[in-house]
């Protein structure tokens, strides 16, 4: 498999060979879906909470007499049928959303995503994206010159300058290979990988 090598203007200067073990896999939609859903589920904190009829603060006084009003009988205003009452099946803060996915499936899913990105032309290689100063404008101008407005950058090393220069850019995410995740790969329109990061990706997902 070959992908484009981009210059500083975002133009393809040549093509580089990338390992088929990571970038030449078949597209496995069901596996990719499973990996993405599991990653999102495992990122949930599970701290949302609602109150049931016992936890709602309310008066125990009967709202109105049992008979003679023509209305349905009611015992407490905390009933789920009443406005401000408790939920019938509330979400509890100890709910666990964890989904287990083994390492072999995760690696295969990530490789399938990388392969599809390469086939669609959404994956490219750059020599380096190092910046000399932690100024956002420097990196923003570089991406503007490359005509990129939604990009995930996988760099071999994210130093302080690159981190500070990129953290305020909208729709730009710069990560090291170990922090690349399936959701970000699917989300961004373009994925740039430095040459040095390619070797790390090969070791991780081959």
From Swiss-Prot:
One of its GO terms (molecular function) is structural constituent of ribosome. Residues 58-70 have a biased composition (Basic residues). Residues 46-77 are annotated as: Disordered. Signal peptide: none annotated. Keywords: Ribonucleoprotein, Ribosomal protein, RNA-binding, rRNA-binding. GO terms for cellular component: ribonucleoprotein complex; ribosome. One of its GO terms (biological process) is translation. NCBIfam families: rplD_bact. Belongs to the universal ribosomal protein uL4 family. Part of the 50S ribosomal subunit. One of the primary rRNA binding proteins, this protein initially binds near the 5'-end of the 23S rRNA. It is important during the early stages of 50S assembly. It makes multiple contacts with different domains of the 23S rRNA in the assembled 50S subunit and ribosome. Forms part of the polypeptide exit tunnel. This is Large ribosomal subunit protein uL4. It comes from Polaromonas sp. (strain JS666 / ATCC BAA-500).
């Amino acid at each position: 498999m070959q992908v484009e090598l981009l210059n500083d203007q975002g133009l393809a200067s040549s093509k580089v060979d990338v390992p088929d073990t990571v970038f030449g896999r078949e597209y496995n939609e069901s596996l990719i879906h499973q990996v993405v859903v599991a990653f999102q589920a495992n990122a949930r904190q599970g701290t949302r909470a609602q109150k049931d009829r016992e936890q709602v603060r309310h008066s125990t006084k009967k709202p109105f007499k049992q008979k003679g009003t023509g209305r349905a009988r009611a015992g407490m205003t905390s009933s789920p049928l009443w406005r401000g009452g408790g939920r019938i099946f509330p979400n509890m803060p100890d709910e666990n959303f964890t989904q287990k996915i083994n390492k072999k499936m995760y690696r295969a899913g990530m490789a399938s995503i990388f392969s599809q990105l390469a086939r669609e032309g959404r994956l490219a290689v750059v020599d380096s994206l190092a910046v000399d100063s932690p100024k956002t404008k420097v990196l923003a101008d570089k991406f503007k010159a490359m005509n990129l407005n939604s990009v995930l950058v996988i760099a071999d090393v994210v130093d302080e300058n690159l981190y500070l220069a990129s953290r305020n850019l909208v729709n730009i995410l710069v990560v090291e290979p170990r922090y690349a995740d399936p959701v970000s790969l699917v989300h961004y329109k373009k994925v740039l990988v430095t040459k040095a990061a390619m070797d790390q990706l090969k070791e991780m997902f081959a």
